[in-house]
């Protein structure tokens, strides 16, 4: 079970296409949330702007996955530490999940930035 979230549709489109091309894995249709503007590689922009704006839609996607499960013990959130969507929006969604489902374990897996990042502010997020 998965919900994919990004503020730029290209990343989600690429991931779902790559998974589908393998023939071994695919993501459920309708379990993605994308917007048209990125977070500008800025944690605060992701957390304070995009996070509150997309929290309800993402929460409903997560709720649908939890309700479809026979039993749910927790939510695993993978988020990139570089940039504004993974770090900022991811942190906001993690807090929202914790508030919405206090009985579930919430585990966050960090995806560390590359040593050769192409964005100057990457280490500061």
Q: What is each model feature region?
A:
Residues 1-125:
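Segments that form or flank anion-binding pockets
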